[in-house]
């Protein structure tokens, strides 16, 4: 149930009846403060201006046409023309009952779309590092949310599996007589990569051989393709371990690397030339874009094929967008790539639109994100100044969580402790990131993320177990509880119920904007409201069975909402802490 959408529809009809244009925006929002009701319609200002009347006068006319019987107990005009809506406790009670009767908690499904989500994108022959964390977990939270809402989601792991580095790596492996790359661990490959690069830079003969190998690889030579495949296989096997540890839904089947688009590039260049979009300039093939200016103020030239015939990332990204629309039949494409790539993507997509490869009706959205910083406010590094490997970060998270959990549960069996430490440690790293607005940089701080107070994973996981503990203490007759009515008579009951019923609205925002922090803030709010409700509205010692059962049902919906909400974020819940 989307109460915001229901009220928007009702207010919009009343505004039109009061003389507003048919496309008027009611601007119904969740109220920021309790005294302003549960929802507020703020659209009178803009519409009144167009109609040449005072907003308050319009609001009064709207109220004469606004029928919220059975939904609101009170509707009032505030300030210059805001309409405050207070939901009826009987309506809240009925909606709580309906939410509990459904596995989906009453969340409706919008029109089904095919949505491609591009995220993670590590490089072959390199271990994943902390720079891959944000794209991987924010993208996965978006995927989980969209799938829960019923969309057909195609995960696209755009791995860096093509380019000159493969000639270099194959040449170096050969030089070391270690063609059987399949037996090497990725840690070895990291060393190989460094050594290969050193030789490539210092030994012209080796560099020449590496360049020849690239040509052979690109021309489809069976031996070189086999060597390349081994490098990709080792990398993706290692990455899968990291994905599984992170509780991320990516698998090997989701890999759509740069190599996939390689055969399409000559055709793209030829087509852009034929359409008059690409021209020869100083030996290279270039698209000049009026939308972007160079330092001189002239249209910026975007190279799509170099003088030597090589292609660029832009060419690949053009082919990639075209493929996602024409072959995958995407209705919408989301890219979880850091903010530094914004101009590059905008240029590629401008070319895509001009060439007619993807119509304007299909959104290409760059859901960019900021950087992960250390406590010093600089990019997060090891003490020695190197890049932090993702596996090392997760090992440390597990170790810290293990100590924390053991301290609080000295008698817990070892296997249970390990399971709990894993949920808390990995959850803490993910939630610390997901709870921040993705567009900003954030400070990575172990102490904050593992704290049991504040908007953290341990607090949220504990809040969930606290609700479950009510049911462990109660001697519950499941049948009697299922048929018991919900009674909303206290303010704290009404506040908790109203917030629980805003779950669908929260999911809708996350799906539209790709902002998991909105879900984190919502769940934290729910946990806080439950805490106040638990303190002031006795559950097990309620004055009678009817009130007890009603409050148990509110607790039940709280537990289900927390669990489902955390699941859309990829955060594991536990039964006890």
Swiss-Prot record:
Cellular compartment(s): Cytoplasm
CDD domains xref list: Anticodon_Ia_Arg (cd07956), ArgRS_core (cd00671)
Motif 'HIGH' region per record, residues: 122-132
Keyword Protein biosynthesis applies: yes
Family annotation (InterPro entries): aa-tRNA-synth_I_CS, Arg-tRNA-ligase, Arg-tRNA-synth_N, Arg-tRNA-synth_N_sf, ArgRS_core, DALR_anticod-bd, Rossmann-like_a/b/a_fold, tRNAsynth_Ia_anticodon-bd
Ligase found in the keyword field: yes
One of the GO biological process terms: arginyl-tRNA aminoacylation
Reaction catalyzed: tRNA(Arg) + L-arginine + ATP = L-arginyl-tRNA(Arg) + AMP + diphosphate
Alphabetic keyword roster: Aminoacyl-tRNA synthetase, ATP-binding, Cytoplasm, Ligase, Nucleotide-binding, Protein biosynthesis
GO MF annotation list: arginine-tRNA ligase activity; ATP binding
Any one Gene Ontology cellular component term annotated for this protein: cytoplasm
One Pfam family hit: tRNA-synt_1d
EC number in record: 6.1.1.19
Domain of life where this protein originates: Bacteria
Record family assignment: Belongs to the class-I aminoacyl-tRNA synthetase family.
Assembly and interaction partners: Monomer.
Protein's recorded name: Arginine--tRNA ligase
Organism whose genome encodes this protein: Salmonella arizonae (strain ATCC BAA-731 / CDC346-86 / RSK2980)
Gene that specifies this protein: argS
